[in-house]
């Protein structure tokens, strides 16, 4: 069997390392850009939903949210109907860096797909979606623990 996950892992680590260098100039620590983007795209999301969206455990989410809140990129607000629920929103500072993060992501995406036709790029995307869907059940079971 072809070990595709090793390749996916190497690609992920390389792109993550590059992103961390780029985002250091806007005071985002390792991997925090992803949280800012997802919260920006899903205003009012709760931590559990963010955990499922990003595919990281709740403890990691809690640490990241705490750091991002401390650094002024996001804020937690109580749900108007249930004060125990804390909803996440980007602050003005978070909104200001969002376009920069997206530009960097688009650049990385175009570099990664250099030499691919539009059809090939779509095929890669479709295959990766299928792979993610295959592991979603395992993730849901793991995350429920």
Language-model segments: what does each one mean?
Residues 42-46:
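Short capping segments at the starts of secondary-structure elements
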Residues 66-129:
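Charged, amphipathic alpha-helical coiled-coil/dimerization segments
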Residues 1-26:
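N-terminal leader segment of winged-helix/HTH proteins
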Residues 31-33, 59:
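Key DNA-contact positions within bacterial/archaeal DNA-binding proteins
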Residues 51:
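The alpha-helix within a helix-turn-helix
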Residues 47-48, 59, 66, 86:
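Residues within helix-turn-helix
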Residues 14, 18, 34-37, 96, ...:
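Pre-recognition alpha-helix immediately N-terminal to the DNA-recognition helix
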Residues 9, 37-41, 102:
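Short, locally clustered residues in the helix-turn-helix/winged-helix DNA-binding domain
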């Amino acid at each position: 069997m072809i070990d595709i996950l090793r390749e996916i892992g190497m690609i992920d680590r390389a792109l993550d390392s590059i992103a961390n260098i780029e985002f250091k100039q806007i005071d985002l620590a390792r991997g925090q850009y992803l949280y800012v983007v997802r919260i920006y795209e899903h205003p009012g999301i709760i931590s559990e939903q963010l955990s499922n969206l990003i595919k990281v455990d709740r403890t990691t989410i809690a640490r990241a949210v705490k750091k991002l809140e401390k650094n002024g990129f996001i804020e937690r607000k109580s749900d108007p109907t249930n004060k125990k629920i804390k909803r996440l929103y980007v602050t003005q500072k978070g909104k200001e860096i969002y376009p920069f993060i997206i530009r960097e992501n688009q650049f990385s995406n175009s570099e990664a797909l250099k030499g691919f036709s539009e059809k090939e790029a779509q095929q890669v995307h479709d295959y990766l979606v299928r792979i993610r869907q295959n592991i979603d059940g395992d993730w849901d079971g793991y995350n429920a623990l």
